Curated annotation (Swiss-Prot):
<keyword id="KW-0698">rRNA processing</keyword>
<protein>
    <recommendedName>
        <fullName>Ribosomal RNA small subunit methyltransferase H</fullName>
        <ecNumber>2.1.1.199</ecNumber>
    </recommendedName>
</protein>
<feature type="region of interest" description="Disordered">
    <location>
        <begin position="286"/>
        <end position="318"/>
    </location>
</feature>
<keyword id="KW-0949">S-adenosyl-L-methionine</keyword>
<feature type="binding site">
    <location>
        <position position="100"/>
    </location>
    <ligand>
        <name>S-adenosyl-L-methionine</name>
    </ligand>
</feature>
<keyword id="KW-0808">Transferase</keyword>
<dbReference type="InterPro" id="IPR002903">
    <property type="entry name" value="RsmH"/>
</dbReference>
<dbReference type="GO" id="GO:0070475">
    <property type="term" value="P:rRNA base methylation"/>
</dbReference>
<dbReference type="GO" id="GO:0071424">
    <property type="term" value="F:rRNA (cytosine-N4-)-methyltransferase activity"/>
</dbReference>
<comment type="function">
    <text>Specifically methylates the N4 position of cytidine in position 1402 (C1402) of 16S rRNA.</text>
</comment>
<feature type="binding site">
    <location>
        <begin position="34"/>
        <end position="36"/>
    </location>
    <ligand>
        <name>S-adenosyl-L-methionine</name>
    </ligand>
</feature>
<feature type="binding site">
    <location>
        <position position="52"/>
    </location>
    <ligand>
        <name>S-adenosyl-L-methionine</name>
    </ligand>
</feature>
<dbReference type="Pfam" id="PF01795">
    <property type="entry name" value="Methyltransf_5"/>
</dbReference>
<keyword id="KW-0963">Cytoplasm</keyword>
<feature type="binding site">
    <location>
        <position position="79"/>
    </location>
    <ligand>
        <name>S-adenosyl-L-methionine</name>
    </ligand>
</feature>
<feature type="compositionally biased region" description="Low complexity">
    <location>
        <begin position="303"/>
        <end position="318"/>
    </location>
</feature>
<dbReference type="InterPro" id="IPR029063">
    <property type="entry name" value="SAM-dependent_MTases_sf"/>
</dbReference>
Amino acid sequence: MSPQPHIPVLLAEVIAALAPRNDGVYLDGTFGAGGYSRAILAASACRVWAIDRDPTAVARGKLLEEGSAGRFSMIEGRFGDMDSLLRQQGVNQVDGIALDIGVSSMQIDQPERGFSFAKDGPLDMRMETKGPSAADMVNDTPETELANIIYRYGEERLSRRVAKAIVEARRLKRFERTGELAEVVRKVVPRSGDGIDPATRTFQALRIAVNDELGELERGLEAAERLLAPGGHLAVVTFHSLEDRVVKSFLKARSGEAARPSRHVPQAQGSGPAASFALLSRKAIGPAPDEARANPRARSAKLRAAARTAAPAWETVS
């Protein structure tokens, strides 16, 4: 029996936000298991491109490409480079972009990838095979810097305590396994009443730092602004407050909302670049109760969507 296909979070809401049309060109910037790509292809007779930096996801995408009759193409790379990657393929504009930020459930479910504290595996956490791993970061980062990483990216109030415990443990033996790290963290972070594992925030922080996820998200949003055609839609799904804050801040600024003390006060003329996006919804969209019950990962998901205006993309400082 073949396995059940992976259904991404907020799938119906993302497709509704993109509103694919038959002659459109669309980008799935975080292919993963391909759920968004397949849904976009099924929604209209359109052309779909996809990007992923995970070699496993790229191989999965190549299989879909082979049976797509020329409607789907897979590109290996980072979504933060989406505009340059598509230009290399002769594509200068797209009509919609979907982004599902962070680690996928399929990556977490593979112990050998080192993302999970629930399943022992090598302490890796890299979405691609190059660059320093989580083990390198845990074993070699000075205590103060490690505490700052855990606090900033994991929002862990006990970050100093965790960093101290890690440094003391690594003096005896370098960390190599996810289980070793999780055990050390659980000894110094008490279990909360919400049932969340004490190691959750530390693992999140390391994963974000190893993969530069927030920097990649910022670059991806700016690239999407350059790549979207006027009237094109951007749909971004996030899973924790740090990601959502980046998306919310970007879209509020680019839509002119950030410059207003109140939505009832008109935008001041000449106060900055023209709005490059118009919000499709003032508030983030969350999962329906049925989806939240069926998929625990969906509970924290938020979708923010906006339409590209005809205004030029804002200048960015690299």
